[in-house]
Amino acid sequence: MFRLTNRLALSNLIKNRKLYYPFALATILAIAITYIFTSLTLNPHLDDLTGADAIKMVLGMGLGIVALSSGIIVLYANSFVMKNRSRELGLYSVLGLEKRHLFSMILKETVIMSFVTLLLGIGVGALFDKLIYAFLQRLIGESTGLVSTFQVMTIPIVLVIFVCIFSLLVLVNGFRLLRLNPLQLTKDGLKGEKKGRFLVIQTFLGLGAMGYGYYLALSVKDPVTAIMSFFLAVLLVILGTYLLFNAGTTVVLQLLKKKKSYYYKPNNMISISNLVFRMKKNAVGLATIAILSSMVLVTLVGAASIYAGKKDYLASSAPHDYSVTGTNVDLTSTRRAIDDFLVQTGNQVNRKVEASYLYFGIKEQEKNKLTIFSENERKVLPKSIFLVFSQSTYKQLTGKDLNLTSNQVGLFTKNKTLKDQKSLSVNSQTYQIHDSLNDFLKGKVPNLFTIIVSDYSYLVVPDMDDFQESIKGTATTQATYVGVNVKDPSHDAKKNSDLLDKITDKETQQLAGQTTGLPKSYFTANSRYDAEGMVNGFVGGTFFIGIFLSIIFMLGTVLVIYYKQISEGYEDRERFVILQKIGLDDLQVKQTIGKQVLTVFFLPLIFAFIHLAFAYHMISLIVRIIGVLNPSLMLVVTIIVCGVFFLAYILVFVLTSRSYRRIVSM
């Protein structure tokens, strides 16, 4: 019996190769991608790249997501394969093979498949390892020398991950065999799914879950809240999608059946009857396609927007080659730190910008009435941020004089409520809004608060001392900024950046009243060289992971669509043969198949685009933390991604439809 199960295992893989080819291809690609991620994460040459810490962190997180996604896809593909082999396994049981023999046979099939796919997957991963490393270097703006070395620990890690996945696969298949008798196995592939119960309740639950998920996505107003709400919104939308596909498709089909003018046409009747026959299975498959498609779109839109927007972020976060920001430090001290740096480096200044301002968070807002946090409420996340400048500083930055009187202010704001106001009250002190200003800090003074809150404002006051007196006792912070562009910024950029860090650290230590921990008064150094390294490393790594996650999600989408078409093709073949015998010609068969396929496979695409539309606001807030501050750019990226995905979906639809028609027409 041992030899018999050996022969059966090998022959079964050969006979069912049409089912196993996509399964094997998906597994090989998943193994190769996991190998590449593991190899890159362990690569010692990452330390030589600018922004190495950011790259390692992103790759480490990506490896976990890739491994989890790979496991889900392999298990899902296996379920389709075993479903289509139910009659075969039932026949073996009827012929005398016991369940332990069937389990032994399936175990050996899995061992053979795992050995072949692991061998090929690791081989493909090793083959493309250097190329992918060069691609990562290109994304983060480094030279593309192929410096990639074989890591001994890469193979054991990949083996552990996929041995666990294949072991789980064996357990799932074994449990499936144990709970079914031979008669059930022979009929399992043919029987239709049972009609769902409590359809009305399911429909309302689905609408409620999806509606609340959409509400969460649209109602968040700052990036931090968006991150905290994102996963809950995703879970609710996934739950709502499955419930609506399961119950909603049933309700719609039953309504169509009641519409006699539509239902009693040969093509419509056959298509609807076939969908009703497999109602529950179609619902789960379609919902899965919709969710996977949404994952592809969200991942690609987010990753591509981050990569496309990195230049804008660099321009706003590091507008100068070298700069020093003083927190609760006067402008003279900040200027002294940058002047000391210029003397030691001998750099010639092309441009110099200086600014002194204060900033605070808003605790409450009632139309144009603002309340600032008190000093003991500093740690509370503000609803919005205000940066306050004197009109003399405004004139230095813009060259324009506002000529404000004692009760007048100039205002630039992202707050929709304040944009239409004629006056502004700050802690009971009322000011007339004399001028509505443009963003006068852009390219001059960095405002890093934009990545924390999308609601921020710049206030220009006639006299800073008077304004500070009016808000005394509140949680405000003074800041000074001095930034310079030098004649040759690329010369000794790293050395100069390190020197500026040392100077600011020394100046910070010399400030009076220092305590352990984060000082109340301190200097912060920034250079475009360091900013580019950090941003390129993080953004390039994020885009790199986004591409590969999108490939995995797309792979899952294609697999589900392909196996769905194949499995339904085999199920429909016998029924269409019967219909042809009772008078349905070939043209009617093709029209009926076409209508069914169109209905089934374009509904998930519509849902995916709807999900993306409602998630767009939340995605835009999340990517703001990474520096995507240009809404127009993100919109263009989204349109391009949707167009490319639509074309890819059409291609998959055309290819899988041919397989379906070929099987049904046999």
What are these regions (language model features)?
Residues K18-H45, D53-G90, T110-V124, Q202-F204, ...:
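Hydrophobic alpha-helical transmembrane segments of multi-pass inner-membrane transport and secretion
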Residues R3-R7, R179-E193, Y570-E574, R661-M666:
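Short cytosolic juxtamembrane segments of multi-pass membrane proteins
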Residues M1-I31, K195-V200, A209, L244-S293, ...:
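N-terminal Sec/SRP start-transfer signal
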Residues Y313-L314, H320-T325, L331-L555:
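Basic-flanked hydrophobic alpha-helices used for secretion and membrane insertion
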Residues T154, L235-Q254, D312-A337, I626-R662:
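Alpha-helical transmembrane segments and their immediate juxtamembrane interface regions
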Residues I112-L256:
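Hydrophobic alpha-helical segments
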Residues S39-D53, I122-I155, G211-M228, L603-M666:
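Short helix-loop junctions at transmembrane helix boundaries
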